[in-house]
Amino acid sequence: MSFRKALWALGVAVCLAAPVAVHAQGDYLDVFVVKVKPEKLADFQALTKKWVDANRRFNGDHWLTLETVYGEGNVYMFTSTRKDYAEIDKTNEASMLAANKAFGKEGGQKIEQDFDNCLVWSRSELRRRRWDLSRKAPTDPDGYAKLIGESRLLRTTAVHVRSGHVPEFEALLKDMKEAGEKNPEAPPVLVSQVIEGSKGSIFYVSTLRSSMGGFDHNPTTREILGEEGYKKFQQINADAVEIAESTLYRFSPDLSNPPDEVAKVASDFWHPKAMMAATSKTKTAPKTAMEPVVAKNPDKKP
């Protein structure tokens, strides 16, 4: 469905056996990536905001939207979590119903057509979250929501693995997970694997930060693995990896409809308009209370 595929993309951490509570966050990432025509950028954003509003008001789908900071320009990524394949149909139906309630059937179809006309290209992927390969992943739903809710940037590396080399690449990630979890300075790393919508085997290795400064002064791969481990890392990369593409994204709250548990972590960021409206009402309330009687009952003109 192009536009209806909302998302909540983020994935590459490192734990050999993920806790049941973390699995409750969903085992799949439903990802929709688009490149927007430069001259259509304003239209794209306006249409997306309409879709956000419809899904928010009528209990449709939830997703996070990210836009490129470093990488191919005018690229946006919409990401949602799914617990299984069946939930994909369920959430798509909820999103369609929300659009029909907000715009009418024909109006919803018109918005989708206009949205498609804004795009240079689009791509859909279903990714399985590899908790067994992820490092320092949160151990409960609240911890996961806090990690996502406080994040403002996502650095993700798409690793294309050569045919026949997936087992050794997975073994390397497990070695990196084990070594990284012993290093108190190593940040969380989330790993996912494309299972629908790709050519060949692709893994996404991702890290989240609350600001650009969070990418400074992190331990290097050599420091985490040690000299022998780093040599093994280089050898397996040379043998198993066809290409690795790194992109830095920032979260776009105005184009997102985050799950409530994520939004409440930083509501001023994820729901800025709602917070501004609440603040405005608070500020104007005293004026109404202090309004003079004359103003409430202005003189009638003949």
Question: Where are the model-predicted features located?
Answer:
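Short S/T/G/P-rich N-terminal loop/turn motif that feeds into the first structured element of a domain
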Residues: H23-K231, I236-P302
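Small/flexible residues
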Residues: A6-L7, T157
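Bacterial N-terminal signal peptides
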Residues: A9-A18
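N-terminal secretory signal peptides that target proteins for export/translocation
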Residues: M1-K5
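Sequence-pattern detector for short linear motifs
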Residues: L7-W8, M290
